[in-house]
Amino acid sequence: MEDGGLGMDAELGADSARRKMEAAGEALEIVPLEMYDSARAKIAANLRWLFAKAFGIDHIPEDLRDPFYRDQYEQEHIKPPVIRLLLSCELYCRVCALILKGDQVASLQSHQSVIQALSRKGIYVMEDDDTPVTDSDLTCQPIKMSSHIPMIDALMMAYTVEMISIEKVVSCVKRFSTFSASKELPFDLEDAMIFWINKVNLKMREITEKEHKSKQHLLESPSHQKSPSKWYWKLVPVRYRRDHASGRQLPYFQMLEDLIRDVCDGAALLTVVHYYCPELMKLDDICLKEVTSIADSLYNIQLLKEFANEYLNKSFYLTLEDLLYAPPVLKHNVMVFIAELFWWFEIVKPEFVQPRDVQEFKDARAVSQPKSARPTVPISNATKRSFLVSPGAADPVLPVQNSPEVCNSNKGSSGFSPSHPLLPLRQRQKKAQPAEESTACRNRSNSLTQEGHPRGSVAWSDKRQRPLSQLNRYVLHSATDSDADLASGDSVSLTCSISEDSLASTVTPKHQSHPGQGSVRRINGHSLLGNVNMDEEEELVAIARADPSKNDITLTNSEDTERQGVTPGAKSIWGRQEDASSDSRTASFFLEPLMPAVLRPAKEKSISLNKEEESGEGRQRGSTRRVAGAESAASSTRRRPPQTLNRTFTPNTSSEFETTIEPKSSEFVPPAPGQMQAFRPLVTSSVEPSSAERSPGFYLHSSVTEEKRPVQAWDAHPGTSDIETVETIEEQDAELTKELHPDKKQHFEEEVESAKLREDMNVKEHEDKDGGSRCSSPGQQSQVSSVASGSIRMTSFAERKMQRFGSNQDIRSSTSSSQRTTPDGSESCPLPLTSWRMKRDQSPTPQNKDNANMLASELVQLHMQLEEKRRAIESQKKKMEILTARQRLKLGKAAFLHIVKKGKSDTLPQPTKSEFYLKEGQKLNEEKEVSSKDDTCVDALRDRSKEAEEPEKASCEWAGGGTVSSSPLDVEEEVDLNECNRSIELLNEAIGSIQQQMMQLSLQQEMLMKQNIQSPTSATSPLANDQINTSEPRVRASIHFVEPSGSPVVRKPPKLSSARPRSKPSELLLGKEHSKGQKSSTPTPTDSPSARSIQGGRTPKAESQDFVQSSVRSESFNKDKGNHKGTTFHLNDEANMRMVSREPSSVALGVTFEESMSLRDTETTFDDGTARDNLISSEDISRGKANLIEVDLSDLAANTDDESTNALDVTADGSDGEKKSGMGFFFKDEQKAEDELAKKRAAFLLKQQRKAEEARLRKQQLEAESEQKRDETRRKAEEERIRKEEEKARRELIKQEYLRKKQLELCEEQEQPQPKPKTKPKKQRLKSVVKEEPSIDPLPKCPAANENLISAQSGSSLSLASVATTEPDSVNSGGAGSQRGESVESFPGLSRNSSRTTERDWDNGSTASSITSTSMAEYTGPKLFKEPSAKSNKPIIHNAISHCCLAGKVNEPQKNSILEELERCESNHLMILFRDSGCQFRALYSYFPDTEEIHKLTGTGPKSITKKMIDKLYKYSSDRKQFTVIPAKTVSVSVDALTIHNHLWQAKRPAGPKKSAK
């Protein structure tokens, strides 16, 4: 549809077309400008046109095709046969006969008869000097080409007049544009052509802008319900946003001012051609630039020539150079070509002429249908059929908005059945319908579904709209890496930024490309990807019409297009349908029709969509995405959104970004692992992917699936449909696998999926059954982790299964450890489970079906749905923030008091937790509160609720240390509140000792900083930690506190820095020193998940501020299975530091006081295993190894940042009053605590010192700048004062000079002798000679230059240099006050004299100053005259008429009448109209400078003269009594006379050199 695609697209298309032309051997060779002979070109062009019209373009005799020949001296001559034809007038008669009608043709016997026939039509054959061409001129020998060329020009003009007229142009323009009849009506044919071309170009500009805006409306308008607006773009890399939207400018449509000069690049004419023939001339094939190069112009001209040769009967009679250089002599040739264009497009109108304005009208009707006008009743089949465009109908431009005009040109495609009506299911159809309706209901499915599939195999019912991105994990199980076109390594859809599982959508296996889909369907010759620079960034463009009911959006992906052989550069977005031949193009490009929606609540109003639906199949992405290979994974990594957008999706703590990035990822290099955040884009769409080919592995409605459903599936409620069943089964079998192999850290995506997410979904699935979207799906791993590494090439489902179940460790890539914060999913699914994968092993269904094409439209669906979610999230943002802040305080206090009061549970009471979460979900109408929690918290919650019946499985929940005690509460009584108090006292003592040591720290700073550098583990930056974590499977010695993957809207971590409060998408504490001096045992299978949870995180820069990390080394207790050696216990209680009892709930190893301001701020979850035993070990306590020490977190933050490579100045940011945001309890090694605190204090003092130094330097710099400004102000004031004094003196000089000249003028008028000036100037000269030096010296030297400049600006062309350098006696011949000669003429006040003399000097080039000459004693010249700028020029005109124009006795009667009229006229400014450059007087005009109108007073000429009519301007020189041409284009009050263009005069008799006016 969008023939007006973006400017970049036009250039791309033009470039690619140019490349194709050159590749085809059509590289153009042109004559350089310096070798171009315009006279020869004029002869050749005229003869070419003449022969074409006389003989017919295809029947020109061979010897006449080239009218020139070269003689033996290499001189070019016209061939004798051509000369004979011209002399015989045969050609002229033939061509003239084409124009004349009836009897007149018979009279054409000679040159004279042709001349007379033309003159009868008002066209006179005139030579350049306005002498008429006669018969003898045309027949004389040797041939006189200077007469034959005007003859052919006159014929061309007559031909032009026949084809185009002002009336025709106006009537045609009226059809598609508006104009002001009083101002814009053309006054001649040339103006009419400019008018027509400009209006067409304006119309095209309007069309492209409208299309661009409507596209933007789809993408950005918040009122558009399904548009992926702000939130969608926030997930998109900046690179894509720049390419995609407002950064790209529209094509430049040029407005002509001069016909010949402005059409020479071909762009304007090609735009006209495109407007009338959009099917034949694509807009993106035209090079539309504001400044076109010669190559671009040549390309355009060549395109124009080819079009004219192919479709317009070879009517382009010029060469490429002729139009490129466009010499003025070829004006008639260009005009006749434009006239032919007009004639073809507006008069003849062949069938290929289909102007865009007609289609725009159709579009307007389609677009005008409101999106909200949804029928409330089902639509009949007849109505469905009526929506379809008949194949024979004219293909309309498909609107961006919803339109009933469906691209129903897919009859030949095997992927689409023409019998499937393109309408959605009826309302509330929950089960598979009979064959004719079940599958046919999906617009998207129809364009993707193979007819061979059973109709009943819809993958889910209409009731449940599942996220389009969350396809079955087996959809592309058998695709190999080779299916992903490696040339398009960046071809992953931008949806990867939105849905972590969308990689599958970017691969269409080769075996799935149907014969009818061999190439991308170019709608109107442009693929749907044209708005993306596919050559550089193989982005998946996701723009199409939204269907209001299903958000069905058509899109393609670049990999498909690449594979299918379409040159990316040639693609443009939104083409129109080409014709029936495009029927067989790729089905995923079919734009969807406007469809009635099934009535269901808006998603914004019910935002708690069942998470089973939202995410259940998202976990299957491992296989789906894996087929795309590491390359796709890398590109999906590249597409990660920036960190600051974290609030719209869930951070994930698993190290998803650690995939090896392909070198191809040039556009977006992921941050260093230390700053990397594993983004979890929200999967908030709920779109129904296509049905039949969805997942050949199983069908929800098939009997096999039904039979294999486990009884225990969480599908109890009637509203829970088959989808939930399958999702539950998949969860269960994934978790079973995890139980079997808990140590696989690099499992594929399914295993990595957080068990917490499944728990969450099942808890919430019944309460938000009807679902809106949810905010996030944190458990789902990103695409990156799903593609373990580039080395893994999954080629079949069987291999995947083998690799999953077999413990082949070689599968796992060390860089892609899909580590989960939840070590094991066993607790999430406590019921007896049957492995769905095992069942699938027995399933006979083939796995190599055509499943990928469906993803095309679904991906854009996701964008649209994400926009819905974004709006819902934003609309409740404030409410949620208030609520979460309140809840944070409440829960923080409750949890803290619960701990202090020695509660019997290790977390919040179970009813409190579950009720709170359920209530919160309901209260917010969305699932942020639950779904966005980190795995650890949710699993902990589920663990508590199921501990009684699943004590064994609970062991895996916090397998941080290894073995788990069978009873979670068996050690509660051992910790006494007194011990806690004693710990507090120890903490206070430690703080006191720290204060005492502060004086020593300045001496120790150097040493300590060196130690920091030398200790590799303590100074390890988050980058290093991440690298270690991802490459080493060993268990870290300290438990890190995991930031839940919650939406930060709900869960804001305490801010230690106000500078970057929101850059925390994935917040996992990494202890900077936690591995120092530690040994960690090799993890056992039970350790491994915990290791995953520790290693998986990223610590971005902001995290190192917001989540203060201090991992303290404690004595290691190696119990059964590799315990953690140290513990980090952060209690981030916003209210206050409080006493914490030393009961298990406060000292258990896995305590998770999450560092966020969210629901579970103080919820603590513990590992029941040996870590607890370690901590409560009396030996430990007695040795003081695990003593509780209170340290202000903000103190530690400084050191943390010092030690990290991020090097953020926490003290600069955090000391602004936010230090108090958190206090923490740490179990520290007492012996080493002082050293560590000393290091921290040293770093803190060092920073403070550095800051003070910087502040001092800044202050000095500011003072220096202010002093400099004061000096500058003083200097300027002094300069101003001096300038004013000089100006005053200058004005005095001007006044004196003026008075002297006035006196001279009066004397001259009275014709009195001037005795005084003779003697006076001599005296003055003597005085001034004496005073010359002193008068110039005190003044600065710059005034002379300034005065020269002023003089030049005032219009004077006097040579100031000559004036300034003349001898003192001549320079200073001025009046009494003149001390410097140049000062007189250079003052603005004297510009009257100087400018007048300047204009006088244009002709003779005199540089003598008139001021100097008039001021000389001997001066007796003509009288001075006044500048007419502010006064009347009547005296000048009077003088001119009397002494120049109408001088002499013969003209006296006319002169007297003219002068009388002149006296009567009240106008101040008058102008004389001359016939031509001979200055024959024709009329007198009055000029009104305000309106710039010129109206006739008396004489012969047009009533008024417009700007376009003026040819030359003249100035009258009173002293020389003659007119001089002014080298100017604009009329002003200094103009005294003018001429108009020759063609505006109509001669009464051709013979007379002077014609009477109209």
UniProtKB/Swiss-Prot annotation:
Basic residues biased stretches: 1317-1328
GO CC annotations, alphabetized: cytoplasm; microtubule
All copies of domain CKK, residue ranges: 1421-1555
Region described as Disordered: 400-464, 504-523, 551-585, 602-675, 737-790, 803-850, 943-968, 1041-1131, 1257-1293, 1305-1344, 1360-1414
Single biological process term from Gene Ontology: cytoplasmic microtubule organization
Pfam families named in the record: CAMSAP_CC1, CAMSAP_CH, CAMSAP_CKK
Signal peptide: none
GO terms of molecular function: calmodulin binding; microtubule binding; microtubule minus-end binding; spectrin binding
Alphabetical keyword list: Coiled coil, Cytoplasm, Cytoskeleton, Microtubule
Listed InterPro entries: CAMSAP, CAMSAP-like_CH_dom, CAMSAP_CC1, CH_dom, CH_dom_sf, CKK_dom_sf, CKK_domain, PRC_barrel-like_sf
Subcellular location: Cytoplasm, Cytoskeleton
Domain Calponin-homology (CH): from-to ranges: 231-346
Entry comment, domain topic: The CKK domain binds microtubules.
Family designation: Belongs to the CAMSAP1 family.
Family matches, as PANTHER family: CALMODULIN-REGULATED SPECTRIN-ASSOCIATED PROTEIN 1, PATRONIN
The name this protein goes by in its record: Calmodulin-regulated spectrin-associated protein 1-B
Origin organism lineage: Eukaryota, Metazoa, Chordata, Craniata, Vertebrata
Gene: camsap1b
